[in-house]
Regions:
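A composition-driven surface/loop motif
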Residues: 1-153
Length: 153
C-alpha cells in the first residue's frame, strides 16, 4: 500500500479521468488495482462535486439570474452576428456581465478552501508497465496522464 496526499480538487480531477478509463490492455490484477483506486477516489470526488453544485445554486445573485444570463448570452450572440433587434441594451448587458464576474469571484472564494483541502488516501499502486498499458488503452492528453501519476509505484 502507498499513502498519498492530494488536494480535493486533484482527487476530483483524477477520478473524472480514471472512472472513464478503459482497462482492456491491463492484466486482471492491474484491472482490479485500478478499479480499487477509482473506488477510493469516488466518495471524495462525488462529495466535492455536490459541494460545487450546492455553492453554484445557493450563491446565485438572484433567483432569476439564470434567466438573465441566458438573455445576456442571446444578446451577445445576436449583437455579434450584426442583428439590430436586440433583447436588451448594452448597459443592461454590462450590468449582467458584472454580476456574472462577481458571482464567479464569490464562487471561487467560497470553494477555494474546499478545493485545496488535503486528503490522505491509501492505494495499491500499479507498475510503470501497467500504467503504460493503461495509457495505451485510453486516449489521454499529457495533462490527464500527469494527474494520474500518483497511482505509480
Amino acid at each position: 500500500m502507498k499513502s498519498i496526499e492530494l488536494k480535493t480538487k486533484e482527487v476530483a480531477e483524477a477520478y473524472s479521468i480514471i472512472s472513464a478509463a478503459k482497462y482492456q490492455k491491463l492484466s486482471d490484477d492491474d484491472k482490479v488495482k485500478v478499479w480499487k483506486i477509482s473506488r477510493k477516489l469516488s466518495p471524495i470526488a462525488e462529495q466535492y462535486s455536490k459541494d460545487v453544485e450546492d455553492a453554484k445554486q445557493r450563491l446565485l445573485p438572484s433567483e432569476d439570474f439564470p434567466q438573465k444570463l441566458q438573455m445576456a448570452l442571446k444578446y451577445q450572440s445576436l449583437r455579434d452576428s450584426g442583428e439590430k433587434d436586440l433583447p436588451m441594451t448594452e448597459e443592461e448587458f454590462s450590468k449582467i456581465a458584472a454580476e456574472w464576474n462577481n458571482y464567479n469571484a464569490i464562487l471561487d472564494k467560497a470553494l477555494k478552501d474546499r478545493a485545496e483541502e488535503k486528503i490522505s488516501i491509501e492505494i495499491e499502486p500499479i507498475t510503470e508497465e501497467a500504467f503504460g498499458k493503461l495509457m495505451a488503452s485510453n486516449d489521454w492528453s499529457f495533462e490527464q496522464v500527469n494527474k494520474l501519476e500518483f497511482i505509480l509505484e
